[in-house]
Amino acid sequence: MEKKSGRSACVAVIRRACAADMEEILQLVGDVFEEEQGIPRALNPIPPENCPQWWCAEAEGRIVGAMAAFVEDGSWHVGRLAVSGAMRGRHIATGLMKTVAASIFDQGADCIYMEARDITVAIVKKLGGRVTGEPVLFYGERLTPAVLERGRFEG
């Protein structure tokens, strides 16, 4: 999909990640979370028992964005949304959220839950999601619980 903004045009292909992508995805997620947000890399892994599924955005042969979906306490969740700094402002995060949500709904989920930073909450609201509680501080930034429901999804 082509993404345009005030920056130069970029073609980012959003797709389900494969095993060969995981090293680059985990490096990107670690860099964004630790270096930009101060969240230790040790908090990034999703336990295998949560059956994580990863998607990535690829541009010019490299991974520039990623997002995971996983099952926790019997419900679908999304998280670990990361876009490289140089590629922000091109709607890659929105594309990832739309693609991941559509796939999880296709797998039978009725709701997808998340605890998200303000910018992600704005994306989720545009896609028909809603805030479900009060924000909490996590490493100095607000995390707000939100849900995206199949019947309200505008993707």
What role is predicted for each listed range?
Residues 113-115, 130-148:
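Conserved catalytic-core motifs of GNAT/GCN5-like acyltransferases
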